[in-house]
């Protein structure tokens, strides 16, 4: 998992606006790389701040789209105006490839000083962990991530330092005065 500071530093090292936005949406919406790279313009529901995602097994889910990401997506789209793909290759005929985006991610991670071996999937992992740290129910996170099995989501419920500190405070209050 990466901290917010590390993610911001990593994204700041991405030169291509299309690659940067694709990685940002992976983090901001908890998407798999395959879901992000193949996002179509029609997947955006700007009025309701939602994205329609076609996930594993062709299953559809709706995820919240933060307003800052929607604004950035609109600005990016105005630069290429591709009628189909949000993140097109240079020729516009196909979406950006997962392989190329993965290479961009690894290069940016190195440039940002991230020494641990990370893949783009760490953005999705970080999204899920942040939601759980903020008290979002595991079942809600399961739905947002498109996990068929709650056990898959449970992987993200490891105790992070903010969770430990919060837990210590709760337990201290519960046990005080016994």
Whereabouts are the PLM-identified features?
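Conserved catalytic core of the tyrosine transesterase superfamily
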Residues: 1-178
